[in-house]
Amino acid sequence: MMFCGVDEAGRGSVMGPLVVGAVFVDNDQILMDIGVKDSKKLTPRMRERMYDQIVGSAEWTVVVASAKDIDDRRKQMSLNDVELYMFADAVNTRQVSRAYADCPDVNETAFSRKLGTLCPSAEIIAKHKADDSYPVVSAASIVAKVTRDRMLDDIREEFGVNIGSGYPSDHYTMDFIKEWIRVNGKAPEHVRCSWEPVRQMLSAKANTKLTDW
């Protein structure tokens, strides 16, 4: 029976989607032959090349949560739980005997147990830095990252300006959001308004207390 790897891209970003990728294989030798590794350790060109090889040789899926989806869900649950349910949605698209996941929670055991409850047919192995240890998780990381990068390219084209990487550490991203809020009085589409830096910008603009989130 197949097994799978699951990983995400965009968890900490302030702009753009959160993407969970899953790759399903009977044997991960083909992924090892491709040379997969954690997507963060690859250049964009290497990721694109490996992405094409992965999706051409293995079953795969992605689950996407937009910025608005994340804001809505964050009113009811933690980001870890948002990711938990997305992981489960990805795993449950196939019948698998085992699922390897890059654990977003500090508690690997608790996250494994929760994911196992949502994916009762699969043995769950959730580890920190699983994308370094399991080729199938590395492949899932690449699928998630390339999918998100392409979606962010579409967002850049939509706005027609440099929006950066979408992460709060990127001054292009934060300058774009700050200027948009200054001019329009609200955050641009594709921005996570539940993120603290954006809340602060909106509060400063409206001169109100942070009571909505």
Predicted regions: what is each one?
Residues 1-213:
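RNase H-like, Mg2+-dependent phosphodiesterase core
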